[in-house]
Amino acid sequence: MKFFKNKIVWASPVIAFVIIFIFSLTAVPTVQPSPKDLPIAVVNADEGFKAPDQEKMNAGEKVLENIREKSGTSVKWVQVASVEEMKKGMDGQEYYAGLVIPKDFSAKQASLQTAEPEAAQMEVVVNQGMNTAASTMAGQMLNGVVDQLNQSIRTQVMDGMVNQGATSLSMEQAEVLADPIEKKVTNVHKPGENSANGNSPVSLFQPLWMASLGSAALIFFLVRKGTVSSRKQSLLVKAGQAAVGVVIALVVGFGLSWVASDIVGIHIPDYMDTAIFLAITSYSFYLMISAVLAILGSKGLPVFGLMLFFGLPLLTLAPEMLPTFYQDWIYPWLPMRFMVEGLREMFFFDHGLVWNGPLESLTAIGVVSLIVLLLSGFIHGAHCIESEKFAFDNGKTT
């Protein structure tokens, strides 16, 4: 039978396996993600303490040395000068969490072996708006650090009192030694309710991407069906293609904001700012897809399908939690990350619609794509002229 002689029939199992292999790779980053160089701020305001006839001690410095030795490569400890500097860094999404050692930490630790002990206090600050999974993990790490310090200090104090010949503890000492370090946990930039557990920026990506991809592909096929006979006409068609994209982008931006807010129920702090940002994002993606299709033709469509399947799992994770290959070679090339980063700043950091890094990147993508799209019209128009000249010369020769 001719059916079994067709090479595609015998190649179909191999093609099926390749498809399975490619799409299985999208799940790799989400299987037991582990952090690497997760930035956590540390403020050591400890002024130290000097007992009579003894050298000055600084327990805060010892704490820093201890946590740096035990954390390995999972955490990048960044020591900052003050709480204000740490909060400024969190506003700029530089740290997932922070640990504050107070100025009287050494003095209160030294008081634990006296008749009037006082518990020291450490503050754990969690920057929830950056990334839910990463900030939660960073907060758990810092809580573990404080718990280990509590146990270590309790053991040291008890051993010291035994060595001094103490046989019993006062009620005050027993109460303080139960928790020699009081832990205060503060959450900043909280996503709040109706935020998909902090993933609302990622939730908006898929519908916007599909709308931009579908509309760009539709206009591309409509343009391809038409015929152009001059360079000027080809340029006008490409300019019209870009102009139609403006209308589509406005519909996508304002429509998605309305659907997300009023139908899905996602909390959007500022409807107008969000709608304009989504419109700019959609237009940038529309131009990018149109430019690629103008160069590669319909062969370029699978590229954007793969970007969707590979990008969606990566966008839910912090870059520091991705495998090295994905972190260095996949994530930086995902244009949709600028959309998620921009929405995160608007939703959780109260930045509003401002000229920042994500908006700059999206604008740059759109401008470059528009230039490529118009150049493709110029080149295509030149081909049309050459084809007409060739046909005319052949007819004249004949």
Predicted regions and their residues:
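Hydrophobic core of alpha-helical transmembrane segments in multi-pass integral membrane proteins
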Residues: 17-25, 252-254, 366-378
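Membrane-spanning alpha-helical segments of multipass transporters and channels
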Residues: 263-398
